[in-house]
Amino acid sequence: MKTLKQAESYIKSKVNTGTDFDGLYGYQCMDLAVDYIYHVTDGKIRMWGNAKDAINNSFGGTATVYKNYPAFRPKYGDVVVWTTGNFATYGHIAIVTNPDPYGDLQYVTVLEQNWNGNGIYKTELATIRTHDYTGITHFIRPNFATESSVKKKDTKKKPKPSNRDGINKDKIVYDRTNINYNMVKRGYNPVGVILHNDAGSMTGLQYKNNLQNAGYNRWAQGIAHSYISEGQVWQALGESRIAWHCANQWGNKNLYGIEICQSMTASDEQFLKNEQTAFYEASRMLKKWGLKPDKNTVRLHMEYYQTACPHRSMKLHVGKDPTKTSITQADIEKLKEYFIKQIKMYYEGKTPVPTVVNQKAKTKPVKQSSTSGWNVNNYGTYYKSESATFKCTARQGIVTRYTGPFTTCPQAGVLYYGQSVTYDTVCKQDGYVWISWTTNGGQDVWMPVRTWDKNTDIMGQLWGDIY
């Protein structure tokens, strides 16, 4: 059996991906659940039937089936099953990612496939979504192994240490299967690299499954040359091709785009490892082109476009979160200096040691005060502290966002009709008034709550109640 920590890694890896376990009917809800149970039981259990039949499977001591009742408390990693009402025919099934998001046992947040019925076309990927308990009748709880039992089993074979805090260059997996589209040739080598944070949750090779055949409309939204996580490099485009990765004509044409993956979901430890693989790859490419790592050849996305990218790296190595506060030119130079030093170590055949700043000692944000009590950051976002509870009255619900208060940022989820959330910040940006809060998992989320006209400062009707 896998541990809960190993199950958590699996769950995070499946966000925004599609799982077709049996090769039939595309990405059905049951495919993800079957694959999950098969994974955490080390291949011992392969569930059968439709989603509603999951509760009738025999798990041979690897999991326990619980019938839902008003006081039942689900846990992270449980499998939740719908079998009644609209779900009586086939059922629905998902994996619990937050057992009680609002602290009232009225809702559960899950990772699921095919909620909207488009899994058969493979256009609906695994999504984190919050539901009330309508139709939910059972939970299946894997009997996870304890960390201590796993450690005891592993004591006979101890892996050799790998390059201190750096990477094992010999174990990097490269996949150079490019996207199914011929981008324009540059005609000369890139003049440098630009390091991005992906604002996503997928590994480098998972991006291949998601983007390789995604189609022109998706690529036009942005496509880099390489997508990199720990020990994984997917080269989506050859170095001779122009990529669309920094919303700047010169940057797109002349710089090689590297996406450091999982910037929204990876632990600090994991993201630092992802960075190291990216630094090594940057050093390898620069050396190939006869370029040395310096301020002209190592670039950041925010040097070319008004963006928070690379938000996670900035927070770790400078101590400032660009989604919440202003970033100065000095901050940019500080992060570039860190990137250059790390890349240069690999360039010279040495092994760098990743470092992070003391978050408690981070620089206070630069603020511009307006006459109405709002502060303005260098992205033009008006913001101020405000603590209250917002209850959604929009029948269709409201989409929430990661990264920042922009409708182009990655979707975090949906606050459904009747659901409430407690927030601590209010912003005005991108044609809307937004509220922001930090989830139990430590992620910052933004949600628009009414329209806003920047020219007149007129606000539309509120999409809920504040109390």
UniProtKB/Swiss-Prot annotation:
One Pfam family it belongs to: Amidase_2
InterPro entries (alphabetical): Amidase/PGRP_sf, Amidase_domain, CHAP_dom, Papain-like_cys_pep_sf, SH3-like_bac-type
Annotated CDD domains: PGRP
Keyword Metal-binding attributed: yes
SUPFAM superfamilies documented for this protein: Cysteine proteinases (SSF54001), N-acetylmuramoyl-L-alanine amidase-like (SSF55846)
Binding site for Zn(2+): 196, 301, 309
EC number from the UniProt entry: 3.4.22.-, 3.5.1.28
Function field: Endolysin that degrades host peptidoglycans and participates in the sequential events which lead to the programmed host cell lysis releasing the mature viral particles. The CHAP activity cleaves the peptidic bond between the D-alanine of the tetra-peptide stem and the first glycine of the penta-glycine cross-bridge. The N-acetyl-muramidase activity cleaves between N-acetylmuramic acid and N-acetylglucosamine bonds.
Description of its domains: Contains a cysteine-histidine dependent amido-hydrolase/peptidase domain (peptidase C51/CHAP domain) at the N-terminus, a central amidase domain and a SH3b cell wall-binding domain at the C-terminus. The CHAP domain contains a tightly bound structural Ca(2+) ion and it is present at the N-terminus and is associated with the endopeptidase activity. The SH3b domain increases the CHAP domain activity.
Annotated protein name in UniProt: Endolysin PlyTW
Gene: plyTW
